[in-house]
Structures are given as structure tokens and as C-alpha cells.
């Protein structure tokens, strides 16, 4: 590949141990090569981009100073782990990242000993690193010895309450723990010029306790008339290390802010911390997301498709239909135009959920609560109790983080919070950590909840309207990542009758009851089955709760077999259907019932179609399920 950058130093790095013999000057050169290598790699594969570019120098410095994997390096979220993977023996696999049978886009314990703790969701690193620190002190890791525990967490992730819960606990325990705050959005504070740089170097240049003692002792040595002024000056100096007061109150020593792209400063501070820290310490590093390529873009290259390095133009397949996310956003905007009580909540995902479009139109009615799903859910519940009509747009996988609030603050009080659950089902390149596999199960078991799933983008538009009109209890509607089916779209949604499904086509012998966007696969399966002389009845449930009991019982009593299909785990729609059939003694009549759900495994990253193939839920799998259920020989199987 002739466009690959020249990387003579990086070419000799097989593991972090190879960094130990490099001079500080060569470590800086290595960082430059590593950044060029990452830009080239992601231009070929796509992936999370900006975060990794922002921590190149930090990654090199950490692996140079510390002894990984003996020292446990825990990356929060781990969007920024690409440089780390390149330095830890996975460079030759980077072109497989986020692809089937390739490297994960996140840290993953089963992938490398240099990934001591997996991640993908936010704000977990300090808790995990503290766990490693306690295990170290109690002799829990006899295989790799007792090393340092280092958490690298971004300023965005610090908006998650779990991070502060961990810091509070760490400060109480007093264990030697290193937290690096990677501040790449200037949301806490930028460095404050030469004074800040001097204070950071001074703090790193002497033992921490000596530094603090000197600061306290110096005041008492002054003549009495000058002591009050000196105390004020000391407080001013303390405030110059912006953010330090908060972290010190939590029990952490504080260093910073420092320039996270200045290799000399990073190495100096990290070496001093390694040599002298005797309790929890936080290093505040200021970095630029997208450093070296995309730092001037509005999103700083958070995630990207394959792209042309010279022009930045992304290589994307042409769109055949609007995305489900965009349909949701446009539908909600249309409803909000007519109803001033409609408000929207997102947990740090305005672009991903489409609420950036809503915010442009209704800035005072859209609330980004940060990475705080627990707060976001209860905040929405409070607005509902106050007479507003909140839509909480949250990915299925992230709604898990606010489940107690869904139960305690929303469901028990029957508050009409409307949950727009994006990324339902299997999501592709982000793999199992972002799959929306469980929301049907964990919502449909709650009394009073209305749970819907859109079979296509037109149905989604109707479900937005339906949720708006449900004003006496909570509701949820789920939809997948990606583009819709290309169906004709109504200008506005029409409220659906609660708990009523729809017949798609009538046949005989077997009925297939769909819930969600597998409907297209069901219809393709029916076409194949028709060539075998089998014409299934197809119905779309629309609702997992309340069930359309009349429709389900009719299908069961007039067919030899009933098969449900859903993009969720066991315990969801199919389980509720089975319970209904059992309670109505339908199984006593000999009905053959099968439920097609996601298997009891975590499915690694691949294309959604490949992931559903692993799950056994594509059209050919539905065909095979129908034939085996009816006792008809399956003529061929996939290799």
C-alpha cells in the first residue's frame, strides 16, 4: 500500500517493552509516527477517530513509563484505544478493526493481556482501576504481580455520576491509584499559561506531601502582618490549578492542568507520579480531540466512515431510504410544532439520537443531561409529573444504565414518559457492548408499560404519534440503527389502537407473528416457502405489551403452528405470547409453538446481516424454522 506513511521507529515496536530503550526525543518522534499510522488505518477501515488522535502522546508516555500489562491501564469507554492497540502487538490486525472476526473497536479482555478491563460504556474506568488497586494490595493477582492501576477518563465521561462515586470511594480508601483526566473539550478548564505550566512542573518536581507541607509551612514563617495576605495568595495559587479543589476534596492529590501533547511534560509528570505517589492522584491533561487531522471539525472526528486522507471526503454507500433516527427526529419535530408541551431528553447523544435536529428547532425544549441516564430518566419523570410530554431518546444499551429509575420513578408512578429506544437489536460494528438485545424483556415485564416496535419507518412515525397520545402511563417504542425499508411515508403519524396488531397476509398451516423490523425477512422467507407449497399467514404484533390477545389466539387456533420472531433476547415478546397460550390452554390442543429470539450468547462485531446470521434470524433461518416445525425436510443448509 504505497500511501502508507513511513514509520521507522514504530516498525520496531512489537510491544510496550520496546519503548523502554527510546530517548525522550525518539518517543516524541514515535508519537508522530503513531498518529500518522492511525490516520492511515482509519482512512481504510473507518471507526472511532478523534478520541484516539487526541491521546497519542499520552498513550506513548504511559506505555513508556509504566510496565504494562503488569501495571493495569484502564481506558474509559475506550473509543481512544486505537493507538494503544497499535503499540501492544496488534498493529498487523488493525485493518480488521470493527469487522467480522477482527479486532474489537474497544478494549477487550479476551483480545489481549494489555486490555485488563473491557469497556464501551462510559464512566467505568475509575471503579475498575480501584478494584485492581485493592486486588493488588490484597494479593489477588499472583500471575502478573502487583502493579499500578491507572484509569484514563475523558472530561465527557466525568459527567457520569459513577465516576464521582468511584472517586469518593477511592479517596476514602486512600489506595495508590492514578487517574488521568483527558480533558479534550475544555469543559473543565484549559491550561492557564505560564503560571499553570510552572505550578504543574513544580508539583511534579517534588514529593507531593513535601510540596503541600511547604505551602502550609511557608505562611507560618512570615511575620504576622503578612500572613493573611500570604494566605490569600496561597488560595489564589491553589485556584490557578483549575479543578484541583474539587478533586482534593474527594481525597485526591491533583496535578495539572498539563499539556497532553507535550511529551516532555507528560514524561516528567508520569515518572514523578510513579516514583512518589502514595495515595490516589489525579493528573489533569488538556488534549485536542482529532489532534493532527480533524481538530478543527465541529465533532472533531468522533467516528467516521472510510475517508480520503487528502480531502477528508468519506466513502459512504448511497442511501436508499431515510434512517430510522432521522424519521424519529422529523416526526417528533412535527408533533412539537403543534404541541408546546413536547420536550426531549438525551444523555450526551444529541447527534446519535437525532435530537440535534429537534434542538435546532426548539432549543429551550431539548435537554442534553450528559452521560447521566439515571438522572435523565428521573428528570423526564419530573417533567411528566409537571404536565409536560417528555420523550427520552436513549439507545437501548444505554437505557440499561437507568433501569432502576425506569421502574421506581416512572413505572410505579405511572408517569407518561415516552422512551424512544434507538439502536434496538444488533447494531453491527460496535458489537455486543452496543447491541439492543434486552429492552423488550426488561420493559414488557413492568406493569402498565406500553411497549411497541416499528416494523418499518412508516410504523415508526405512527408510533411517535401514538406515544404522544398516551398520557396516563409510560410507553416505549423501539427501532434499529440504519436506514428504513424505503416504504411510502405518511406526512404525519396516526395514533395506533393500543394493544392491536395488524394482519399482513393470510395463509394456512403456519402463522408467523413478527415484532419489529424482522418483518422484511419474514416476508422474504414466505416467498421462498411458497415455492415449497407453503403459504404462511403473516402478522405484525406492533405491541409486546399489551399483547393483542385476540389476534394471537386466533392465529394459534386456526393454524397448525405459530412462530414468533423478534430482535431481542429470551424473556421478551415470545415469552409473553407463550404465557398467554398456556393460560388459555391453547397448548392442550396440540399447537406447535416456536419463538425465534436472539441466542444466549454475546455476538461480536460484524455487519448486522452477519450478526443476525449468527443469531439464526435471517430469511433462510426463518424458512428452516418453518419447515422443521411442520416436519418438512429441509433441502439444504448453509455451509
From Swiss-Prot:
Signal peptide start and end residues: none
UniProt-listed InterPro entries: Dxylulose-5-P_synthase (IPR005477), THDP-binding (IPR029061), Transketo_C/PFOR_II (IPR009014), Transketolase-like_Pyr-bd (IPR005475), Transketolase_C (IPR033248)
SMART domains referenced in this protein's UniProt entry, alphabetically: Transket_pyr
UniProt keyword Lipoprotein present: no
Reaction(s) this enzyme catalyzes, per UniProt: D-glyceraldehyde 3-phosphate + pyruvate + H(+) = 1-deoxy-D-xylulose 5-phosphate + CO2
Cofactor(s) recorded in Swiss-Prot or TrEMBL: Mg(2+); thiamine diphosphate
Binding, Mg(2+): 155, 184
Cofactor note: Binds 1 Mg(2+) ion per subunit.
Binding positions (thiamine diphosphate): 79, 120-122, 156-157, 184, 293, 373
Coiled coil: none
EC number(s) given by UniProt: 2.2.1.7
GO molecular function: 1-deoxy-D-xylulose-5-phosphate synthase activity; magnesium ion binding; thiamine pyrophosphate binding
Biological role stated in the UniProt entry: Catalyzes the acyloin condensation reaction between C atoms 2 and 3 of pyruvate and glyceraldehyde 3-phosphate to yield 1-deoxy-D-xylulose-5-phosphate (DXP).
UniProt record similarity statement: Belongs to the transketolase family. DXPS subfamily.
Subunit structure: Homodimer.
Name of the protein described by the UniProt record: 1-deoxy-D-xylulose-5-phosphate synthase 1
Organism name: Jannaschia sp. (strain CCS1)
Amino acid at each position: 500500500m504505497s500511501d502508507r506513511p513511513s514509520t521507522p521507529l514504530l516498525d520496531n515496536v512489537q510491544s510496550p517493552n520496546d519503548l523502554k530503550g527510546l530517548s525522550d526525543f525518539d518517543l516524541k518522534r514515535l508519537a508522530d509516527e503513531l498518529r500518522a499510522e492511525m490516520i492511515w488505518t482509519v482512512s481504510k477501515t473507518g471507526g472511532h477517530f478523534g478520541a484516539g488522535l487526541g491521546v497519542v502522546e499520552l498513550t506513548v508516555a504511559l506505555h513508556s513509563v509504566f510496565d504494562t500489562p503488569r501495571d493495569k491501564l484502564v481506558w474509559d469507554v475506550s473509543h481512544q484505544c486505537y493507538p494503544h492497540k497499535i503499540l501492544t502487538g496488534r498493529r498487523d490486525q488493525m485493518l480488521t478493526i470493527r469487522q467480522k472476526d477482527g479486532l474489537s473497536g474497544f478494549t477487550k479482555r479476551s483480545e489481549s493481556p494489555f486490555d485488563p478491563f473491557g469497556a464501551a460504556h462510559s464512566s467505568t474506568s475509575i471503579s475498575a482501576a480501584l478494584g485492581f488497586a485493592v486486588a493488588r494490595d490484597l494479593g489477588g493477582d499472583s500471575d502478573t504481580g502487583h502493579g499500578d492501576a491507572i484509569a484514563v477518563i475523558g472530561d465527557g465521561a466525568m459527567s457520569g455520576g459513577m465516576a464521582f462515586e468511584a472517586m469518593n470511594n477511592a479517596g476514602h480508601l486512600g489506595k495508590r491509584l492514578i487517574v488521568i483526566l483527558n480533558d479534550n473539550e475544555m469543559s473543565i478548564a484549559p491550561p492557564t499559561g505560564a503560571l499553570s505550566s510552572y505550578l504543574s512542573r513544580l508539583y511534579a518536581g517534588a514529593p507531593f506531601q513535601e510540596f503541600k507541607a511547604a505551602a502550609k509551612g511557608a505562611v507560618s514563617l512570615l511575620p504576622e502582618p503578612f500572613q493573611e495576605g500570604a494566605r490569600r495568595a496561597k488560595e489564589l495559587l491553589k485556584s490557578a490549578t483549575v479543578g484541583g479543589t474539587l478533586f482534593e476534596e474527594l481525597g485526591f492529590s491533583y496535578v495539572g492542568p498539563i499539556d497532553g501533547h507535550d511529551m516532555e511534560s507528560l514524561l516528567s509528570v508520569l515518572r514523578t507520579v510513579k516514583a512518589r505517589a502514595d495515595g490516589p492522584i489525579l493528573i489533569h491533561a488538556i488534549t485536542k480531540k482529532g489532534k493532527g487531522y480533524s481538530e478543527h471539525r465541529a465533532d472533531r472526528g468522533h467516528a467516521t466512515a472510510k475517508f480520503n486522507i487528502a480531502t477528508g471526503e468519506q466513502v459512504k454507500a448511497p442511501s436508499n431510504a431515510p434512517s430510522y433516527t432521522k424519521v424519529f427526529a422529523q416526526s417528533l419535530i412535527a408533533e412539537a410544532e403543534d404541541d408546546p408541551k413536547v420536550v426531549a431528553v438525551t444523555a450526551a447523544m444529541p447527534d446519535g439520537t437525532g435530537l440535534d435536529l429537534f434542538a435546532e428547532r426548539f432549543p429551550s425544549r431539548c435537554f442534553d443531561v450528559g452521560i447521566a441516564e439515571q438522572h435523565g430518566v428521573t428528570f423526564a419523570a419530573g417533567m411528566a409529573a409537571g404536565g409536560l410530554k417528555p420523550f427520552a431518546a436513549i439507545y437501548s444499551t444505554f437505557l440499561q444504565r437507568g433501569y432502576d429509575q425506569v421502574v421506581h420513578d416512572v413505572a410505579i408512578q405511572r408517569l407518561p414518559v415516552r422512551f424512544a429506544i434507538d439502536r434496538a437489536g444488533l447494531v453491527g460494528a460496535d458489537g455486543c457492548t452496543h447491541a439492543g438485545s434486552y429492552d423488550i424483556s426488561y420493559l414488557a415485564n413492568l406493569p402498565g408499560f406500553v411497549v411497541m416496535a416499528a416494523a418499518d419507518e412508516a410504523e415508526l412515525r405512527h408510533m411517535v404519534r401514538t406515544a404522544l397520545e398516551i398520557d396516563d402511563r409510560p410507553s416505549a417504542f423501539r427501532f434499529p440503527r440504519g436506514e428504513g425499508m424505503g416504504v411510502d411515508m405518511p406526512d404525519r403519524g396516526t395514533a395506533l389502537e393500543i394493544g392491536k396488531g395488524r394482519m399482513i397476509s393470510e395463509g394456512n398451516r403456519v402463522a408467523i407473528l413478527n415484532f419489529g423490523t424482522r418483518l422484511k425477512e419474514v416476508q422474504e422467507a414466505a416467498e421462498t416457502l411458497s415455492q415449497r407449497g407453503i403459504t404462511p399467514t403473516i402478522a405484525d404484533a406492533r405491541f409486546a405489551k399489551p399483547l393483542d390477545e385476540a389476534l394471537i389466539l386466533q392465529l394459534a387456533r386456526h393454524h397448525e403452528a405459530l412462530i414468533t420472531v423478534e430482535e431481542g433476547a429470551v424473556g421478551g415478546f415470545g415469552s409473553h405470547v407463550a404465557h398467554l397460550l398456556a393460560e388459555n390452554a391453547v397448548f392442550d390442543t396440540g399447537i406447535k409453538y416456536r419463538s425465534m429470539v436472539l441466542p444466549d450468547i454475546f455476538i461480536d462485531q460484524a455487519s448486522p446481516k452477519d450478526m443476525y446470521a449468527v443469531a439464526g434470524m435471517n430469511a433462510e433461518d426463518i424458512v428452516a424454522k418453518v419447515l422443521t416445525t411442520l416436519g418438512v425436510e429441509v433441502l439444504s443448509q448453509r455451509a
